[in-house]
């Protein structure tokens, strides 16, 4: 990401450094720029909100988007690439049920329109996590 404002760019770097395994977005900032609300999300967390104090360079948790979801119990979404018969490399995401060996399990393949337009992205998905929790590997092909 390229920020046009050096202060905001540094703030984004500080937040990403403090929350390294999440996709982070500043969703609101005070008019003087000292406080920001940050949403951090991942493949296993639909969103946790933080207050970022720029003067102190501190994050404090405000709350979670879905309190009933324990990220430690959810499955990881891994980016993958494989070659098609015609030699084209196809990107996608593979979610293997947590705590299961990645062999001989049923798989749900989630196709969509394309190759341009709709696509899957790395992040939390209720549907993917539901099927993974029931023992299915989930393959999302872009």
What spans do the regions from the language model cover?
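Structural motif
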Residues: 1-12, 44-51
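A short helix->beta-strand "capping" segment at the edge of beta-propeller domains
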Residues: 11-22, 77
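Serine-hydrolase catalytic core recognition
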Residues: 27-142
């Amino acid at each position: 990401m390229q920020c046009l404002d050096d202060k905001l760019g540094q703030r984004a770097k500080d937040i990403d450094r403090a929350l390294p395994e999440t996709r982070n977005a500043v969703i609101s900032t005070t008019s003087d720029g000292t406080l920001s609300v940050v949403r951090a999300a991942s493949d296993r967390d639909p969103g946790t909100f933080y207050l970022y104090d720029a003067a102190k360079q501190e994050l404090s948790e405000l709350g979670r988007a879905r309190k009933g979801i324990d990220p430690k119990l959810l499955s990881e979404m891994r980016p993958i690439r494989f070659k098609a018969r015609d030699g084209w490399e196809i990107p996608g995401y593979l979610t293997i049920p947590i705590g299961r060996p990645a062999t001989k399990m049923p798989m749900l393949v989630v196709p969509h329109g394309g190759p341009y337009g709709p696509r899957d992205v790395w992040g939390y998905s209720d549907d993917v996590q539901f099927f993974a929790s029931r023992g299915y590997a989930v393959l999302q092909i872009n």
